[in-house]
């Protein structure tokens, strides 16, 4: 048995994800696959289109063997923290052999080199980074510019790279996530072997509904603007279409950030600037801007655009909104940063090969798998707080769902993992 790990959001699972899954199995020579997937809130600070169990079902129906939930604390965080949480779960399972991710270049050695610079933080890089931050440039862009400065002084030919290729690499979101995965593997001294495959066709933020392969961003934008699922049938597997169609017909989605907007804005309007300043990632006077914009806006997207600036990216503002909604406090983030254990494998969907992964992990490690929350007792306060946040995220996400059956709370206690029985 050779087990492949994937770190995913599947919002929703589309043909590009299917290509990534199939090619990842080939390149890593894996027999079994486990995906660590975000739950109801995502890395860009947005709610998922449909609930996590349906998205996990999409993955298993398409060939993933086991889907575990990435705890909300990590799922709705920076690329660095998101990667740290997901890689830590794969590490603690004790059985994952490989991790494969998509990148625009498909050049693992170049990505490793960038990860090494970020880990070691050479003086020249730190000086450049500080300079760009002082110019008011947002951290992600400032870091990319500092890396470009650093590599422009190096001979990149030994990595099969040119300065132009390195600049292109550092500007792409998918490459940045890949670099963070490699950093997390290195910092945790992981035995998991990394691979990357070149993304096929549509770019990460492409908004074009191209033939066959398109981005999740394009799919979500199309649904937001038209609500027409039939026009994207060419870009998603049949099983994804069926699941989305069933969910939409039952008023289970699609869910967008504005559906939670009034809840979030009402929370912010009840706060003082001093209270807003205590929220994680708020600083340097941003609390005043948030306070003013909340009282000038009646839609969440309008509010986020109002707050956004050269220094504060839209994604950062969206994540701040979700932290307010979910009451994510700094002490828990600090605990998670320093925790080497305490994570868990919340099972969302699996098949018979997924069951084999679980059994092997239970033999090789003490990593806990959760099928039913009611039957799991957290071993410490950190784990309890992580799980409580996941439950709270589901309860609040449910408020955006029009279907009365799902809009009630406690869905985490009532919903069982999806099981796909393989034909023998």
Swiss-Prot record:
Keyword Transcription regulation: no
Name listed for the protein in its UniProt record: tRNA(Met) cytidine acetate ligase
Protein keywords: ATP-binding, Cytoplasm, Ligase, Nucleotide-binding, RNA-binding, tRNA processing, tRNA-binding
Reactions accelerated catalytically: cytidine(34) in elongator tRNA(Met) + acetate + ATP = N(4)-acetylcytidine(34) in elongator tRNA(Met) + AMP + diphosphate
GO cellular component term of the entry, any: cytoplasm
Top EC class for this record: ligase
Superkingdom of source: Bacteria
Family from the record: Belongs to the TmcAL family.
Gene Ontology annotations of biological process type: tRNA modification
Known role: Catalyzes the formation of N(4)-acetylcytidine (ac(4)C) at the wobble position of elongator tRNA(Met), using acetate and ATP as substrates. First activates an acetate ion to form acetyladenylate (Ac-AMP) and then transfers the acetyl group to tRNA to form ac(4)C34.
Gene Ontology terms, MF aspect: ATP binding; ligase activity, forming carbon-nitrogen bonds; tRNA binding
Keyword Nucleotide-binding in record: yes
Record's subcellular location: Cytoplasm
Binding, ATP: 7-20, 102, 174, 199
EC number annotated for this UniProt entry: 6.3.4.-
């Amino acid at each position: 048995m050779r087990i492949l790990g994937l770190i995913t959001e599947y919002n929703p699972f589309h043909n590009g994800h299917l290509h990534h899954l199939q090619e990842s199995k080939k390149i890593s020579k894996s027999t079994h696959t486990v995906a660590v997937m975000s739950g109801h809130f995502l890395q860009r600070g947005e709610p998922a289109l449909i609930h996590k169990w349906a998205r996990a079902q999409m993955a298993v129906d398409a060939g993933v063997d086991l889907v575990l939930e990435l705890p909300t604390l990590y799922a709705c965080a920076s690329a660095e923290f998101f990667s740290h949480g997901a890689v830590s779960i794969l590490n603690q399972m004790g059985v994952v052999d490989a991790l494969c991710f998509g990148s625009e270049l498909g050049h693992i050695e170049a990505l490793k080199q960038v990860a090494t610079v970020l880990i070691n933080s050479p003086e020249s890089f730190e000086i450049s980074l500080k300079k760009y931050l002082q110019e008011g440039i947002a951290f992600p862009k400032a870091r990319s510019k500092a890396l470009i400065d650093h590599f422009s002084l190096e001979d990149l030919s030994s990595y099969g790279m040119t300065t132009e290729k390195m600049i292109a690499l550092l500007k792409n979101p998918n490459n940045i996530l890949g670099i963070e995965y490699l950093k997390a593997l290195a910092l945790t001294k992981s035995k998991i072997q990394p691979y990357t495959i070149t993304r096929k066709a549509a770019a990460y933020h492409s908004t074009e509904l191209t033939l066959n392969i398109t981005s999740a961003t394009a799919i979500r934008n199309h649904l937001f603007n038209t609500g027409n699922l039939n026009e994207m049938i060419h870009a998603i597997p049949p099983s994804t279409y069926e699941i989305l169609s069933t969910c939409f017909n039952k008023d289970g989605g699609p869910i967008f950030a504005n559906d939670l907007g009034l809840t979030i804005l009402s929370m912010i309007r009840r706060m003082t600037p001093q209270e807003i300043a205590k929220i994680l990632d708020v600083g340097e006077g941003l609390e005043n801007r948030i306070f003013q914009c909340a009282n000038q806006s009646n839609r969440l997207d309008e509010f986020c655009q109002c707050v956004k600036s050269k220094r504060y990216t839209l994604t950062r503002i969206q994540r701040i909104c979700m932290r307010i909604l979910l009451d994510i406090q700094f002490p828990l983030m600090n605990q998670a940063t320093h925790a080497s254990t305490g994570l868990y494998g919340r099972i969302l969907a699996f098949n018979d090969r997924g069951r084999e992964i679980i059994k092997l992990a239970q033999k090789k490690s003490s990593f806990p798998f959760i099928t039913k929350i009611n039957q799991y007792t957290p071993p410490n306060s950190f784990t309890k707080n992580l799980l409580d946040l996941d439950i709270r995220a589901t309860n609040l996400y449910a408020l955006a769902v029009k279907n009365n059956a799902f809009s009630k709370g406690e869905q985490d206690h009532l919903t069982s993992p999806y099981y796909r029985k393989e034909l023998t």
